[in-house]
C-alpha cells in the first residue's frame, strides 16, 4: 500500500493527507484498503512525495 506508506512517513492522518493533496478522505481510504489505486496526477504526486517530500509539500502550500 504505497499511499499509506507515503502518508505515514510524512506523519499525516488520513484526513490531513487528503486535505494536503486535495482528494477526498474516502479516496485515501480506498487507496489504503486496496479498493482503488491512484492514477494519473495523483500517482505522480505520490511518487514525488515519496522521493522529495519537502519540495512537494512546499509546492502544495
Kindly give the residue locations of the regions a language model identified.
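Conserved hydrophobic/aromatic packing and binding residues within compact polymer-binding modules
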Residues: 17-18, 28-31
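Long, hydrophobic/aromatic-enriched structural stretches that serve as scaffold segments
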Residues: 20-23
Amino acid at each position: 500500500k504505497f499511499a499509506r506508506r507515503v502518508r505515514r512517513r510524512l506523519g499525516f492522518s488520513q484526513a490531513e493527507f487528503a486535505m494536503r493533496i486535495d482528494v477526498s478522505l474516502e479516496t485515501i481510504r480506498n487507496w489504503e484498503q486496496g479498493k482503488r489505486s491512484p492514477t494519473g496526477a495523483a500517482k505522480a504526486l505520490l511518487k514525488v512525495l515519496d522521493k522529495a517530500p519537502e519540495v512537494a509539500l512546499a509546492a502544495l502550500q
